[in-house]
């Protein structure tokens, strides 16, 4: 019995009917999210900045947003506020490398529903997504 495969299988969710908008401008982070989310069967939409995220949100039915906060053109805080103005019930999970004191509170004030500090561990990502997508 291969324990590593069992753990990996436990992490894999089946979200074939779900749409996740990933807002990320750093290629290495995009690769992580792509690899992590591919096996969930969720449809993944990509935005490279906050303005593109707001536009994509308006044009698509989205179940959850993974929002980087430090973005070009429009930051993640502003994009979060604009998306929440459109749909207050959409879960938005902040993901940021800024882990200074007060950062979580700043995210929540902007309207984020949860917060992930980079580097993000796969188990924590899946647990957090499950909390919102398995309702």
Where are the regions that the model predicts?
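The feature encodes the CheY-like receiver
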Residues: 72, 100
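Conserved acidic carboxylate
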Residues: 24, 48
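C-terminal output helix
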Residues: 120-129
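Charged docking surfaces used in two-component/phosphorelay signaling
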Residues: 31-39
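Disordered, acidic interdomain junction associated with two-component signaling
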Residues: 1-19
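Active-site beta3 strand of CheY-like receiver
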Residues: 60-66, 71
């Amino acid at each position: 019995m291969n324990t590593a495969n069992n753990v990996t299988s436990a992490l894999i969710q089946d979200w074939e009917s779900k749409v996740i908008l990933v807002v990320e401008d750093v290629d290495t982070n995009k690769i992580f999210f792509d690899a992590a989310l591919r096996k969930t069967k969720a449809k993944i939409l990509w935005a490279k900045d906050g303005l593109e995220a707001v536009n994509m949100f308006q044009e698509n039915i989205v179940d959850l947003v993974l929002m980087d906060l430090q973005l070009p053109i429009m930051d993640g805080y502003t994009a979060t506020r604009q998306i929440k103005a459109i749909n207050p019930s959409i879960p938005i999970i902040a993901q940021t490398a800024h882990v200074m004191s007060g950062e979580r509170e700043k995210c929540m004030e902007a309207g984020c529903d949860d917060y992930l500090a980079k580097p993000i561990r796969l188990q924590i990502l899946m647990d957090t997504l499950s909390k919102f997508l398995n309702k």
